[in-house]
């Protein structure tokens, strides 16, 4: 008969009658445990092998579990054939919770045990297979000889060598020879003899040389000669003879040589006057002479001091004014004297000599100059004004104001185109004293 095995616990209990248990001896009970909890314990059954897995060897973890859960756990084991009995003493709600917890722990330990048993069984099977392999050498040799060696030899002998030889002899060599003999050499010879040489010769003889010669002889040389002879030389000659030389000669003879000859003959002033008179209109000269010179002389005479004007008239302005009058066209001087009488009268006090000379020159030359301007060309007017009336002006000045010009110096240009009159010292000395 199996003996009862008990595990360690905080309070040793003994089964009394029915479901009642009693305390063995007089142990010290925990404060959270009461005696009435011994009357109706909660029972559960597990495999005996799981008891030591759950509570340790001989139940060494039971006292710690009891203190933690505030219940008493009593385990009875009657051998490996029977299931172990677990008794839970405590409040009813605690009994239910602890029983559920212990069942979960038992299930977890059961699964671990099954894995362990399966692992051990697998290891045993592998060990058995290994032992069989070591103890049975003949099957190993048979497997190596029957499965490995024979197929390898058959594949090497039947599959590889035969196809290689057949492919080399039947498929590779014969087609190569046939291809070289039937397709390559014959077409090469035919193409070289029939297709290539003949077209080359035909193209060289029929297509290339003939077009080259035709293009050189028919298309290129002829147009070149025609263009050189018909298109280029003729226009060049026509342009040189008809368009360019004639205008050049006409322009040289009509426009350029004539002024050059006139300038050479008159020593530069005459051509300038002729070109100005011929190219520019007469109204331009009238406007310039009427608007610009007269106001300048009036402003100079009215605004500048008398001594400055006398000194300028005695030393510098007198030659300048006479030279301007001699080089510029006579109509300008006549028009200045004839049209601008009022400004001249303003300068009577300061420039007496110039005023009288201007009046005399205006009286003698105004009628003649207007007649010459109306009846002659601008060139003749300028020549008549500069050459013909210079003597009249000097005579008029000497006859009109002999008392003022007496004792003064008079100079005439080489070509008698103008007269320079320098008043005597008695005339301009009173102005200098001022």
UniProtKB/Swiss-Prot annotation:
The modification Phosphothreonine is found at residues 267, 279. Residues 40-118 form the KH domain. Residues 334-434 are annotated as: Required for interaction with NUMA1 and regulation of apoptosis in response to DNA damage. InterPro entries: KH_dom_type_1_sf (IPR036612), KHDC1 (IPR051778), MOEP19_KH-like (IPR031952). Residues 1-39 are annotated as: Involved in RNA binding. GO terms for biological process: actin filament organization; establishment of organelle localization; mitotic spindle assembly; mitotic spindle assembly checkpoint signaling; negative regulation of apoptotic process; positive regulation of dendrite development; positive regulation of double-strand break repair; positive regulation of double-strand break repair via homologous recombination. It comes from the Eukaryota. The keyword Nucleus applies. Keywords: Cell cycle, Chromosome, Cytoplasm, Cytoskeleton, Developmental protein, Mitochondrion, Nucleus, Phosphoprotein. Belongs to the KHDC1 family. Contains 1 atypical KH domain, which is still capable of binding RNA. This is KH domain-containing protein 3. It comes from Rattus norvegicus. The gene is Khdc3.
